[in-house]
Design a protein with these regions (language model features):
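The feature captures the beta-strand-to-loop junction immediately N-terminal to the Walker
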Residues: 33-35
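Helix-to-loop junction immediately C-terminal to a conserved catalytic motif
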Residues: 48
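Conserved ABC transporter NBD signature motif
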Residues: 53-72
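Q-loop/switch helix immediately C-terminal to the Walker
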Residues: 82, 87-102
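Conserved ABC ATPase "signature" region
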Residues: 96, 106-123, 139
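Hydrophobic anchor residue at the start of the ABC signature
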Residues: 138, 177
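Catalytic Walker B motif of ABC-type/P-loop ATPase nucleotide-binding domains
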Residues: 149-153
Length: 202
């Protein structure tokens, strides 16, 4: 499904990580571990195609993602560490725009149902708490049928209820044959299939 082959990432004169390799199969949940500065976010950006590795290659279904481009983008959901939601829009408007940009269509009913399930109030995002903003971003997972999820610190700012909801989503994704790569600084109850440890960092 997803293959990382001898990935290396450099920032200036510093090497964040090197020789990172794994093959992620359907139904697997992979946690990326490592201290701050070890390159966890950089690895996820490389895996989703937003950044290029200094060396190595990412493959999706045996094809280099550089060749697949938009076709690969439609097969994944990437949610970064900072919730990518616009303050002046409502959660539903943000969700609709993110689906359009990703080329992943969703009905108005599906958008409303996703936000209701995650208990996100329909207010301008600037009025939401950090945890509610995170839930608004995570609603993408409910309206997408993408087989691959790449999640950077998805549990950050969530309360106990939010963590439980996200755990349920992750379990449903892998039980349905999807795959997940995520980073986290906290034990959140979900048990990963495997761990890639990037080490101590800077």
């Amino acid at each position: 499904m997803l293959e990382a082959a001898e990935l290396e990432c450099e920032r200036g004169a510093r090497t964040l990580f090197r020789a990172v390799s794994f093959v992620l199969a359907p139904g697997e949940l992979l946690r990326v571990a490592g201290a701050n500065g070890s390159g966890k976010t950089s690895l996820l950006r490389i895996l989703c195609g937003l950044a290029r590795p200094s060396a190595g290659e990412v493959r999706w279904k045996a094809e280099p993602i550089a060749r697949l481009k938009e076709d690969y983008s439609r097969e994944l959901v990437y949610i970064g560490h900072a919730p990518a939601v616009k303050d002046d829009l409502t959660p539903r408007e943000n969700l609709a725009i993110s689906c359009i940009l990703a080329g992943q269509a969703a009905s108005a009913e599906a958008l409303a149902e996703a936000l209701e399930r995650l208990r996100v109030p329909e207010l301008p995002v600037r009025k939401l708490s950090q945890g509610q903003r995170r839930r608004a971003a995570l609603a993408r997972l409910l309206v997408s049928e993408a087989p691959l999820w790449l999640l950077d610190e998805p549990f950050a700012t969530l309360d106990a209820q939010g963590i439980s909801l996200l755990n349920d989503l992750l379990e449903k994704q892998v039980d349905g044959g999807g795959a997940v790569v995520y980073t986290t600084h906290q034990e959140a109850g979900i048990r990963s299939t495997r761990v890639v440890d990037l080490g101590a960092g800077a």
